Amino acid sequence: MDSVIQKRIFVGNIFHNADDCYSELLDRFGKFGDCQDFQFEKHNHFAFIDIRFNDEADFNKLRKSFNNVKFKGNILKVDEAKPNWESTWAVQHAKDLKEDIILNAKMKKKNWQHYKKMENVAKSWKDHKEVIAGRMREAPRKRSQLRNITFRINVNGSLKVYKCYKTKLWGYERNKELNDLVYKFTNNFWKNGYNHIVDRLDYSRAVKTVRFKNGLKQLTVSKDENVCSGEMDSDENMSEEEKEKNNVILNDLLKDFDFDKPMTLNDSDEELLTEQRKGEEEEEEEEEKEVNAPEYENVNKTKDQSTLPQEKPEERKEQDEGDGQEDNEFIPTFTKEIGQGTISNTETLRNLFNPNEAEPVSQFKLIEDSDNDIDHAKDVDVNQLEEEVSKSSDTLGLTSAPVPHVSRDKDNKNFLFFPHLQSPFLVGQTQLSKVRAPGRETMLSNWDEEFWANRGNWTRDMRRKMKDALKHRKRKQSKSGLLL
């Protein structure tokens, strides 16, 4: 019984007496096996029936007995039938599913290779060097491990595990009020608007040491755990009683003060400013008189006046003495200030090209103290030196170049440090900056009125010039085209 098989038998090529043939063939097929159906599954010229055989030999006997046999005018075709469409579809569907899985895997691999190739092409050198590709974890993290989040990274060929430190200070919650916002940080405590402690900043577990290597010596600095543990803020130390005392004292001080009444200003500073302005106006008037003086004045007279120090008005002297008493600060003073009034271009150019005629001598001193440490007994007389040199040259009979005149001005002691007025280059720059072109200041004084008055005419002129330029360019282009 273990060798019992069931087969679907195909009977075909039946064109004559189909009903009689099917009824007689059913009885004859029963001799070789057990027919599972009471009749054939009929179609146009063929039929099917399921028969159970004891072994394969019974099926072979049946096929030899009836295949290619003439039966009632029909040449029979008997053989094992092909499986029905449902079974074939099931087998083919299972086969297709397996093939689809393989094809999808191949397609994914191909698409991934193409994606990585395009991503590699789009990356810059910095991305190739610094960006490290990672992946998202597939399984969710356990609840007990949420506080100890780590990540793995490939460092120099070895896999390292690092801990993700919490850097977020505070977040946003929808059901919280404005006073619940954490905004105050005092004594390593985060506090909200109600002055409640929300979070504590504690570095006791994260003790680190810093080492500085310097050859054979090493300096190690460790972090103290109890730093700022006993210190408190001034706001924390201040009790309510002290705050009330301070408020009472401020109330007593400001009780009788009228905030609406304007305060009276001290006019001492304004008086000093008015005196300074008066002195400056007087100096400007004197400078204007000197600039507008006739050109044929005696030059020696101007030299003598320039060498002598200018006398200050009495008011300015008193003011300078008062300033010296208030502020003991040394301020270098010069003999002559640059005038801010009217400027004469002729006088400026004359001073520029003849600087030696009226060059002011500076009274600038680098050190205010007297030169007590200088031995003036050993000073060399310049006239005596010139006479000795001339006598020696006469005795030798040599003709030498004249000795340059050495300045004996006592004020020029600090040869390394000299004021602006004694520098030939800077004086020239200053004089050139005073030269002004005539009429430049009044050129654009009434520019708005002139623009709105001539706007239409100027626009028409510009358009006409533009048209002429375009015509001229077209003519040139047409001529060049004809030549080609």
From Swiss-Prot:
Keywords: Nucleus, Phosphoprotein, Ribosome biogenesis, RNA-binding
Statement: the UniProt record of this protein carries the keyword Disulfide bond: no
GO biological process entries: maturation of LSU-rRNA from tricistronic rRNA transcript (SSU-rRNA, 5.8S rRNA, LSU-rRNA); ribosomal large subunit biogenesis
GO molecular function, one term: RNA binding
GO cellular component: nucleolus; nucleus
Note: Present with 2170 molecules/cell in log phase SD medium.
Protein name as it appears in the record: 60S ribosome subunit biogenesis protein NOP8
Gene: NOP8
